[in-house]
């Protein structure tokens, strides 16, 4: 059994969504945690739970961030967590239950394990995992949109994300 200690200082969770049919808006969640258990040498034994604090959303625009925290989007006054709980893990895919605004759907995402390295600063063993995917926000009750005069809508329904998580590990 491998002990995993999440290193939030060397981890990130970033997303992007199509805006006004012509560009992308990017942002991040600044507060999240990932708990992992299992044997790093046997991916089938790995189980993980990611917890994201949606009120930590950061798009570098305070007015937009406040709107994203409102009931039009994440409703952070009522829903203070987003969770992803794995069901299965392989070297290239992770399947699990994603819960946003109290709505749970099974999702499959791409995963990249980056091996094990020794941290020269403290001698600890570390590993990194990158998870990427696309989520249809409307499946989670995040339906806010506005029609454009030129056709189309203000926001895309698909949100692309990349989560990069680093862990100190020990046996």
Curated annotation (Swiss-Prot):
It comes from the Bacteria. InterPro entries: Lipid/polyisoprenoid-bd_YceI, TTHA0802/YceI-like_sf. SMART domains: YceI. It holds the Pfam family YceI. GO terms for cellular component: extracellular space. Belongs to the UPF0312 family. This is UPF0312 protein SAOUHSC_03022. The lineage of its organism: Bacteria, Bacillati, Bacillota, Bacilli, Bacillales.
